[in-house]
Design a protein with these regions (language model features):
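Core segments of cupin and vicinal oxygen chelate
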Residues: 1-26
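A short, acidic/glycine-rich surface segment
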Residues: 2-7, 33-39
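Short, well-ordered beta-strand micro-motif
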Residues: 18-20, 30, 89
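Short, conserved, surface-exposed binding loops centered on an aromatic residue
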Residues: 18-20, 39-43
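Generic beta-structure capping elements
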Residues: 22, 29-31, 101
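Vicinal oxygen chelate
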Residues: 33, 43-45, 49-95, 100-106, ...
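A short, polar/proline- and glycine-enriched secondary-structure boundary/capping micro-motif
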Residues: 37-41, 107-110
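A short, polar/charged loop-to-alpha-helix boundary motif
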Residues: 104-120
Length: 145
């Protein structure tokens, strides 16, 4: 029965859309007979989003210009130090981020490698204290004001 949700048996006609991303897929649902879904008012708008990597800065700007030519509001590029991002919303209201890695070094080593070495320690501190770890505070000092 095409009107039944396979995992729950719930009666709710839907369209299941898959977007291939490299070796993975993102799955989206359209539920035409359901009330319009809202957002979680307790979650800031910037928190829940999907980030996808693009090839280079030129491609990032090309996509930004294309989206703007279609009438989309695009924020950025935003300098995060180790990558630059643009942000926009899809027609269903999902926030999307496109990122391109940047070459950044810290004390003569790739910033990404330094962050990977610190990851476990930072996660442990976060889990124990609930406070943002200070291990990568140096990264924020490299950002444009």
């Amino acid at each position: 029965d095409l009107d039944k949700v396979p995992s729950t048996g719930e009666n709710n006609p839907y369209m299941h859309i898959f977007l291939q991303v490299g070796q993975a897929h993102l799955a989206f649902f359209e539920l035409p007979n359901s009330p319009e879904m809202g957002t979680d008012l307790n979650t800031p708008n910037w928190v829940q989003h999907i980030a996808l990597k693009v090839k280079n800065n030129e491609k990032l700007l090309q996509i930004k210009n294309y989206l703007e030519s279609l009438g989309h509001n695009v924020l950025g590029p935003v300098n995060h130090g180790i990558f630059h991002s643009i942000y926009f919303h899809d027609p269903s209201g999902h926030r999307l981020e496109l990122v391109v890695d940047q070459e950044l070094t810290y004390k003569g080593e790739s910033a990404n490698k330094v962050l990977k070495k610190l990851a476990d320690e930072m996660l442990t501190e976060w889990s124990l204290t609930g406070e943002p770890p200070k291990h990568a505070q140096w990264l924020h000092s490299t950002l444009d004001s």
